Amino acid sequence: MGTPVEVSKLHFLLFPFMAHGHMIPTLDMAKLFATKGAKSTILTTPLNAKLFFEKPIKSFNQDNPGLEDITIQILNFPCTELGLPDGCENTDFIFSTPDLNVGDLSQKFLLAMKYFEEPLEELLVTMRPDCLVGNMFFPWSTKVAEKFGVPRLVFHGTGYFSLCASHCIRLPKNVATSSEPFVIPDLPGDILITEEQVMETEEESVMGRFMKAIRDSERDSFGVLVNSFYELEQAYSDYFKSFVAKRAWHIGPLSLGNRKFEEKAERGKKASIDEHECLKWLDSKKCDSVIYMAFGTMSSFKNEQLIEIAAGLDMSGHDFVWVVNRKGSQVEKEDWLPEGFEEKTKGKGLIIRGWAPQVLILEHKAIGGFLTHCGWNSLLEGVAAGLPMVTWPVGAEQFYNEKLVTQVLKTGVSVGVKKMMQVVGDFISREKVEGAVREVMVGEERRKRAKELAEMAKNAVKEGGSSDLEVDRLMEELTLVKLQKEKV
């Protein structure tokens, strides 16, 4: 099914939340819409434009002269006037700066997004887009868009499973302790979880009211865009459209839209390691022999835990690539590595301090497993690369994502984390790290399932695939809305 001629006239205004996990797939989405003949404009702040968008957008536009240019619209964000530290334009600032109260500042940062309401109104008047893709953390954007007759699509940055799980979750009254597993009610699959793994907010708290506003704005919106593909979460896609949002389109995996080496290398921030050197190191390794380990941008472990991870990796006997994010003043210190560790594992291990070219690494034939914090972008990149996973969730919806991998897809092994890091956090011993790494690297049935899912992911985004057709359907619906408005 092809897209109608009128689709080329569509103009998408994309407004991502100012965090890696939201900005990166938003850029991928803009590229996707461009390949379908639409124009895309990304709204962001000066710092984020420079860090995340300017270079890859310039490259994309130059490489695709036949497509509508992706453009950037800058919105100023007066941090200090809003009670935030100077330069606090994304969550990376919050999680990488020492001596900050992460919890308080994160909440203040979220609530400060309301500042953009008035500038967005002005832009909708002057730009007259055909659709606003507003991040979930901008609940006020539904009413703003409605005021000007613009359909607002919600983007969460996660998959159907976690969206359904968070909709269904009700903490049971009959469990003895917060660590006792219970089945999530009404959710297909009899999924087990514990109270310690669920992020709950008091209804009358500031965050409780904010989350209610998110749910209400989603209900009143035009629909939801989901970075996933039907074959991955079939039962949960059906459930979501039947009981949660009614209207949703799966358009992923968005990361697979990046086909050129440079696109993959430039995805996100500039890598802290030369990607060619990294791949050269991997080229010297046997197929499926290396475990890749990364915990995302918002996780930072204490030294004691990092020492256990290092020891567990060493004990496993497997070669590894380990991405380590250190916070603030920790960056210069190397007391988190066991004495002589790097010398002992020289040739067997590669430690990347900072940002890694993750998609390039995951796709390399030498990588045989992925130890992940279960952030949705990382998890989906692992699925697209056909990798079995060791799951180490930290917070947010990551425990739900872990259940999808371990209980539904059966392509992962849990390292044994029992509770959220935001609360207290678990301490995982070197023996658990060793055991999980060994198990995931040798399980052939698990690996076979993972490779089958990767093939499904690639087929989903090909012409005529499930996600490709879904994008066409979305375009056609928005085109009809546009044509009806023009008749009035």
From Swiss-Prot:
The protein's induction, as recorded, is:
Not induced by pathogen or salicylic acid.
Q: Which CDD domains match?
A: GT1_Gtf-like (cd03784)
The record's listing under Pfam families reads: UDPGT (PF00201)
Signal sequence segment: none
The yes or no answer to whether the keyword Transferase is present is yes
Which keywords does the record carry?
Glycosyltransferase, Transferase
Q: Name one GO molecular function term.
A: quercetin 3-O-glucosyltransferase activity
Task: Tell me what this protein is called.
Answer: UDP-glycosyltransferase 73B1
Annotated organism of origin: Arabidopsis thaliana (Mouse-ear cress)
